């Protein structure tokens, strides 16, 4: 080998090409991709002259337009061998380094970098020492290439053939995996001896690191041998099973089930059960019937939302806005939901409430539950309980039965995919029971906040937590087993007033009718007067279902008229509504047209809301018999007997001769005859009808009444006051007599109802007679000898405590 020294050369001007993340050494042939405008112009300048360019590395690779101070002083003068312009505007250039050079100063050119530079000479050095160093470098380089797989082995052969020590040092330096700063340091070193020593030092350090890396890889490989061995054995087992005809998918299914078990947040009990079932499944033939049962079980168990919760919205203003937008009125329910959200915003451990919405059909119980789910951010699932008679519908069947499945509760939870949905149990009062069990008793565990955290389905046989579920049940009446009702917070939803129905129509029903019938708002309109006419003359209900049907009918007729070309716009008014809906079905006004003897208007509370109840009484010659008709049940029959006994005991005060009762028969009838009726709340109406019949004094047609009567003439409180008052308002009644103890319930009655009715609380039957009859009966004198001896005074107060009648 030889050590050539380069004589010092004079300075010359060269275009400068700043490089990023690369240092080009002399004797290297390197392809470069050039994209910066200045650099491209520098290359164009070079190609037009002697093709010599100065390649210098910039200090910061991220700098797009570096200042001269941000570029290293020492670089390489190179020849441009080839230049190729690419379609994207960049230039590919092939350069060959010639010699080291140092920049003296930059020339003031703006279009590209240009600098005055001079080549750096190499000093004279001891050739023997350099020869020894070069041999060590080549030997070490061979070891380095063997360990570093990124360098081609051919490079070692090339390096060993190089006779120029300077070229050898630069070639080795260019292939080392060292930092740019260290490569630049090698470039700036002119001494061949020092370059070889640095290269040797860098290689020894890299070889040490690579040897440690190799040892680590060997150790990891040994640790992985066991896993790989098991993998190979499993692959062989799969191949054997495939040859034997077993399904390859069966093994994949096992791996999938195992992965699902590990990823699902099962409870400790459920995880143990799942692992046991999977172990059992591994030992079965995939084609066996029992394997299908186990697979189905694991699918159900892993398909449940274990610990997956929806994020509950706690923004009270947003919740109120959603509830008010979807439903008009229903303030009590909305208030309860907002209270729950308020508490939940403070405490995340609060259990979901269990509400029971009780009210007549069509008042929005089911749709309100959907609205609550939207307001709280919960998933909504609905389970219809109407007609459910089998306890297994709730708790599921045991796995011993063929075709067994979990109950509807677990099925719904899987469908919801979240562990905290809003669960609507619809029509809970319509459940039945037979020899298969009582589903209402199975619901006791589901709806008990203290127990439902450990709900156990017969099919799953592991406990599942339902405590985060918000349960809402709906019912038309409280015909629910007491233990079940005790677990729920009952919220009554009475019917709507006429004003509320009109608002509901304007906000919800009319826009829905227009949307569903593809009408435009400017094509179809219904005036407020027409809406009131529909409410009063074509529907009589607590809810708005029939009201909606009538509005849909109006929309259909409007579409028909528009398509026939009769008109471009249909406006329904109170005057032309008969043309669309026909003859009015109901008469809005008093229940009776005239004041009549023995005919009184009572108020009843049914599962479809409040109703007017006409009670008729007639008297005829006979033997003192009392006849009652109208499909009356036991409680109402007893109520009539109590009313008759009260009137008979007060006969003289009412101007009735006592012997008259033995010579006359009284017949009390409650139309309609086909409708079953029960309850004690018509007692005051019965007594009023009997007094009117016996005295011949007519009853005012615009009075309705409700209340239970005692033998002493006291009027006891009743239930369903709001529904009864709404029925009186719908029927055009002007004056309503209610028990005095129900006066406290008037606070829950809408103001427009109280303002439209004259509501009079009464405590004794004498007050009822005074308000109901057109005139008071006059007491008569009666021969004491003909009266029974020592009867207690009927005016004495009843000593018994207050009893509540519904």
From Swiss-Prot:
Its EC number is 3.4.21.53. Residues 14-207 form the Lon N-terminal domain. Residues 594-775 form the Lon proteolytic domain. The keyword Protease applies. ATP binds at residues 359-366. InterPro entries: AAA+_ATPase, ATPase_AAA_core, Lon_bac, Lon_bac/euk-typ, Lon_lid, Lon_proteolytic, Lon_Prtase, Lon_prtase_N. The active site is at residues 681, 724. One of its GO terms (molecular function) is ATP-dependent peptidase activity. It catalyses: Hydrolysis of proteins in presence of ATP. Induction: By heat shock. SMART domains: AAA, LON. It is an enzyme of class 3 (hydrolase). GO terms for biological process: cellular response to heat; protein quality control for misfolded or incompletely synthesized proteins. The keyword Ion transport does not apply. Keywords: ATP-binding, Cytoplasm, Hydrolase, Nucleotide-binding, Protease, Serine protease, Stress response. GO terms for cellular component: cytoplasm. Homohexamer. Organized in a ring with a central cavity. NCBIfam families: lon, PRK10787.1. ATP-dependent serine protease that mediates the selective degradation of mutant and abnormal proteins as well as certain short-lived regulatory proteins. Required for cellular homeostasis and for survival from DNA damage and developmental changes induced by stress. Degrades polypeptides processively to yield small peptide fragments that are 5 to 10 amino acids long. Binds to DNA in a double-stranded, site-specific manner. Belongs to the peptidase S16 family. PANTHER family: ATP DEPENDENT LON PROTEASE FAMILY MEMBER. This is Lon protease.
């Amino acid at each position: 080998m030889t050590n050539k020294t380069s004589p010092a050369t004079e300075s010359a001007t060269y275009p400068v090409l700043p490089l990023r993340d690369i240092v080009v050494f002399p004797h290297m042939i390197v392809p470069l991709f050039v994209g910066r405008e200045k650099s491209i112009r520098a290359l164009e300048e070079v190609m037009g002259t002697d093709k010599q360019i100065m390649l210098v590395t910039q200090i910061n690779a991220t700098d797009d337009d570096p200042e001269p101070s941000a570029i290293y002083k020492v670089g390489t003068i190179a020849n441009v061998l080839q230049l190729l312009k690419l379609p994207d505007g960049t230039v590919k250039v092939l350069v060959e380094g010639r010699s080291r050079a140092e920049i003296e100063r930059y020339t003031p050119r703006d279009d590209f970098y240009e600098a005055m530079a001079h080549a750096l000479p190499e000093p004279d050095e001891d050739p023997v020492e350099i020869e020894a160093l070069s041999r060590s470098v080549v030997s070490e380089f061979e070891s380095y290439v063997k360990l570093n797989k990124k360098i081609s082995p051919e490079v070692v052969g090339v390096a060993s053939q190089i006779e120029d020590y300077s070229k050898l040092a630069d070639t080795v330096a260019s292939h080392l995996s060292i930092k740019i700063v260290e490569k630049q340091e090698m470039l700036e070193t002119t001494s061949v001896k020092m370059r070889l020593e640095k290269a040797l030092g860098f290689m020894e350090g890299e070889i040490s690191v690579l040897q440690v890396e190799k040892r680590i890889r060997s150790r990891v490989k040994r640790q992985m041998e066991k896993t790989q061995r098991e993998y190979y054995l499993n692959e062989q087992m799969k191949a054997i099973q495939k040859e034997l005809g077993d399904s390859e998918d069966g093994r994949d299914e096992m791996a999938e089930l195992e992965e699902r078990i590990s990823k699902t947040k099962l409870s400790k009990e459920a995880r143990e059960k799942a692992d046991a079932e999977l172990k059992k499944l591994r030992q079965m033939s995939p084609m066996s019937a029992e394997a299908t049962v186990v697979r189905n079980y694991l699918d159900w168990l892993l398909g449940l939302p274990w610990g997956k919760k929806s994020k509950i919205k706690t923004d009270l203003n947003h919740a109120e806005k959603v509830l008010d937008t979807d439903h008009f009125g229903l303030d009590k329910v909305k208030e309860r939901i907002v209270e729950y959200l308020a508490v939940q915003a403070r405490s995340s451990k609060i259990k979901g409430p269990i509400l029971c919405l009780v009210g007549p059909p069509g008042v929005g119980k089911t749709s309100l539950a959907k609205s609550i789910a939207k307001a709280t951010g919960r998933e909504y699932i609905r389970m219809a309980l109407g007609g459910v008679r089998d306890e297994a519908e709730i708790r599921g069947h045991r796995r011993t039965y063929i075709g067994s499945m979990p109950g509807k509760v677990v099925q719904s939870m899987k469908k919801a995919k979240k562990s905290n949905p809003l669960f609507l149990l619809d029509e809970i009062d319509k459940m039945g029971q037979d020899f298969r069990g009582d589903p209402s008793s199975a619901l006791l565990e589901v709806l008990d906040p203290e127990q439902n955290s450990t709900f156990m389905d017969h099919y799953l046989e592991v406990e599942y937590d339902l405590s985060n579920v918000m349960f809402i049940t709906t019912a038309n009446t409280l015909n629910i087993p007491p233990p079940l009702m005790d677990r729920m917070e009952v919220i009554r939803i009475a019917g709507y007033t006429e004003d509320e129905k009109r608002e509901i129509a304007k906000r919800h029903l009319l826009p829905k009718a227009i949307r569903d019938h593809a009408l435009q708002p400017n094509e179809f309109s219904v005036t407020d007067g027409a809406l009131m006419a529909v409410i009063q003359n074509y529907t009589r209900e607590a809810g708005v279902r029939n009201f909606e049907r009538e509005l849909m009918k109006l929309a259909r007729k409007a579409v028909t008229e528009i398509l026939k070309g009769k008109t471009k716009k249909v406006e329904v008014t109170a005057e032309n509504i008969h043309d669309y809906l026909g003859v009015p079905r109901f008469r809005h006004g008093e229940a009776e047209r005239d004041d009549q003897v023995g005919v009184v208007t009572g108020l009843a509370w049914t599962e479809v809301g409040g109703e007017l109840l006409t009670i008729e009484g007639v008297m005829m010659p006979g033997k003192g018999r009392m006849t009652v008709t109208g499909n009356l049940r036991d409680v109402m029959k007893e109520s009539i007997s109590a009313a008759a006994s009260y009137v008979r005991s007060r006969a003289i005060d009412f101007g009735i001769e006592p012997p008259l009762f033995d010579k006359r028969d009284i017949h009390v009838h409650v139309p309609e005859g086909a409708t079953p009726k029960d309850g004690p709340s018509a007692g005051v109406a019965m007594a009023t009808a009997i007094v009117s019949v016996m005295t011949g004094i007519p009853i005012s047609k615009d009075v309705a009444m409700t209340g239970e009567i005692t033998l002493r003439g006291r009027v006891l409180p009743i239930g369903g006051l709001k529904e009864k008052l709404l029925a009186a308002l719908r029927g055009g009644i002007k004056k309503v007599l209610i028990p005095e103890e129900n006066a406290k319930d008037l606070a829950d009655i809408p103001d427009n109802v109280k303002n439209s009715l004259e509501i009079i609380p009464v405590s004794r039957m004498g007050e009822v007679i005074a308000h109901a009859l057109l005139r008071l009966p006059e007491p008569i004198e009666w021969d004491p000898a003909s009266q029974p001896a020592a009867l207690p005074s009927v005016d004495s107060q009843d000593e018994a405590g207050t009893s509540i009648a519904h």
